[in-house]
Amino acid sequence: CEFTAKHGDLDLRFTPAPTAQEGMTGHAMAAARRGAGYRSEVALSGQYQNLRVRGRCDGFDPASRRLDEVKTFKGSLERQPAVQRHLHWAQAKVYGWLLCQQEGWNALDVALVYLDIGSQQETVLVEHCSAQQLQEHFEQHCGRFLLWAGQQLAHRMARDTALQALTFPFGDFRAGQRPLAEAVY
C-alpha cells in the first residue's frame, strides 16, 4: 500500500518519530489495553490474480468485528500530513479485506489507533466498511501494483535485449588494461 497509495508530497516525515523500540512498546501497550478476546499480531494473506499479498495486522476484536492498525507517534497528531494518514488508511483497509475474507465477514470496523508515546494517550479513528468496499480497495491497489510491475518487467526485458545486442567498442584490451583488470579481480 505504501507504494500504490502514495500521492501528493514526497516528504512523508512526521517528526519527531518514535524509535523502533518505542514503537514495539507502544504496540504492546495498545494490545494490553484491549479485552480478553482481542487477538494481536494476526498474519493475513490473500490473492489477486497472480499476486500474493501477505501482512500482519496489529490486532482485531472478533466480538466487535474491529480491526486495529496501531501507529505510534510523538508530539501533536494534528501536525501529521494528510498524505501519511491516507497511507495508514490504505494499509488498514487492505488488512480489513484480508480479515473479512479469512473470517467470512460481510463488514467490519477499521480503526487507526494513534498512540502518543509521550502521554500514552490513544486517538482512535474508526470507519465502518463493507466487505465489498474493502475488496474494491484491495483490488484497486493490487491492480495498480501489477500494472507497475508489468511495466518494470517490460522495461527490463527491453533493456536486457538491447544490452545483448551491444558490442564492446574494442576487440582486445588496450595496453596495460589486462594487468590492471587482473590486479583488481
Question: Which residues does each predicted region cover?
Answer:
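Generic recognition of stable, solvent-exposed alpha-helical segments in well-folded globular domains
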Residues: T25, L87-A90, C129, Q133-Q140, ...
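Metal-dependent nuclease catalytic cores in nucleic-acid-processing enzymes
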Residues: A28-R34, V83-L112
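A broad, structural surface signal
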Residues: A28, K93, W97, G143, ...
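Conserved catalytic cores of phosphodiester-cleaving nucleases, focusing on short active-site segments
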Residues: H27, G55-P81, Y95
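Alpha-helix N-cap/helix-initiation motif
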Residues: Q80-R85, F173
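Metal-dependent nuclease catalytic cores that hydrolyze phosphodiester bonds in DNA/RNA
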Residues: C1-R65, A90
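Conserved pre-motif I regulatory segment
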Residues: Q152-Y185
